[in-house]
């Protein structure tokens, strides 16, 4: 199982930890999407920036 993560809000006014987590997930701008594996580490990063992204489950890796 994999997760499609899309950034829906910008990073102006957010904390450094949140910006760093977005970069670690591979997100650089609004409406940019990446597919990441469904692991506890990725879920933890998503939890930190949950107000800035949307997450969808997709089949495959």
UniProtKB/Swiss-Prot annotation:
The keyword Ribosomal protein applies. It comes from the Bacteria. One of its GO terms (cellular component) is cytosolic large ribosomal subunit. The keyword Cell membrane does not apply. GO terms for molecular function: structural constituent of ribosome. Pfam families: Ribosomal_L30. Residues 1-20 are annotated as: Disordered. InterPro entries: Ribo_uL30_ferredoxin-like_sf, Ribosomal_uL30_bac-type, Ribosomal_uL30_ferredoxin-like. Keywords: Ribonucleoprotein, Ribosomal protein. GO terms for biological process: translation. Belongs to the universal ribosomal protein uL30 family. PANTHER family: LARGE RIBOSOMAL SUBUNIT PROTEIN UL30M, MITOCHONDRIAL RIBOSOMAL PROTEIN L30. Part of the 50S ribosomal subunit. This is Large ribosomal subunit protein uL30. It comes from Corynebacterium kroppenstedtii (strain DSM 44385 / JCM 11950 / CIP 105744 / CCUG 35717).
């Amino acid at each position: 199982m994999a997760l499609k993560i899309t950034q829906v809000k910008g990073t102006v006014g957010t904390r450094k930890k949140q910006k760093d987590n977005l970069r670690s997930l591979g997100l650089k701008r609004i409406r940019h999407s990446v597919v990441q594996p469904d692991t506890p580490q990725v879920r933890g990063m998503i939890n930190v920036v949950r107000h800035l992204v949307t997450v969808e489950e997709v089949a495959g890796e």
